[in-house]
């Protein structure tokens, strides 16, 4: 802390407090995460950006998926039957969420980890899929293909809450598990 404080003081003395640009991450998109240091940075007089650097994209995706750009309440995961952790080492980087996942698991939820890296989270999964790096989209397309082909989609819900499902179904029609397996390095059974 002394080293950081000394460096801050040197920068402020030489260039002004605006020369310090804090980087902020929203973590699991919670307001607590994104606003944690606001009072300190304001008091210091540091430069500020609105939101996190990736916030606009994450917020738009969350709003489209969940109906709100603020993310979902992580405690709702305890009611899940299936939790898919895709490209995230949750046990290491989102430690406050892992106990909620364990609670869901104790209630019967299955945890699938999809990640090109074998992480501590992957080691804890009920099922670990390790696609080749950069092949996530092929796997996603094949998963959608199977959901539609095997009539695992709630058509009534889709009709009431989505737009363009028919276009999506047409787009994924050629993304068979065999095609995805060739791209991802996974087996067709996976």
Residue ranges and their predicted role:
Residues 1-190:
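Cofactor-pocket helix-loop regions in the catalytic cores of large enzyme subunits
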